Amino acid sequence: EDKLDYTLFEKNVCGGEVFEEVSKDLNFQGRIIDDLEKKFGKNNEDVLFQKKFYTLVELEHLEFINILNDQCDLGMATILFFYSNEEKGIEQSEEVGRLLNTVYARNSDSLLIYSFDVNLDSNLISKLKLKYDISESPVIVVNEKIKIFNPQNLEEIEQTLEKSEDESDGSSIIYLN
């Protein structure tokens, strides 16, 4: 609803508390997913349904943050984290998740991280995987421009954040058009 106030009903998008207002629902929905996964398991049908809704909420939030960055010079960096809860990739995904938690803690005023389950049966996830050429996990996409397969340490992620506008140096980083 808050996002609609700014987009559809033409409320001043660059107003003081816009970021906080549009972020409240995202944070609330994320906590619900965490609680449901702990209570019922990551593969529970109701949990998976809620994750589909959360994917939509995340993408709407990302879209709005892009508007704030473009029109209001918000200066918020973004990381899209593509992970797997399947046995084959869960350990690597959880390790990258821990790294991202640390990166976020160090940069919480200027960074947003959006997490997407690559195995979720969702048209939105399929479209994201196609858009960012995601065929495995874990993968992060920094500022929707730079893709890193299975980042190994904090420095790799933080350096990529710092130089997200620079050209590739030949590592496991891929620059997207």
Q: Where in this protein do the model-derived segments appear?
A:
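Thiol-based oxidoreductase modules, predominantly thioredoxin-like and allied folds used
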Residues: 81-85, 108-123
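Second-shell loop/turn segments in exported
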Residues: 38-47, 84-91, 145-147
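Sec-exported extracytoplasmic/periplasmic mature domains
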Residues: 62, 105-108, 162, 166
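Loop/turn elements at helix/coil->beta-strand transitions in domains of secreted/extracellular proteins
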Residues: 76-77, 108-112, 136-137
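Non-globular targeting/processing and membrane-anchoring segments
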Residues: 1-77, 166-177
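Typically the conserved alpha-helix immediately C-terminal to a functionally engaged Cys/Sec
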Residues: 90-107
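Coiled-coil termination/hinge junctions
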Residues: 73-82, 93-95, 120-121
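Non-catalytic, surface beta->alpha helical segment in thiol-disulfide oxidoreductase systems
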Residues: 3, 19, 136, 141-177
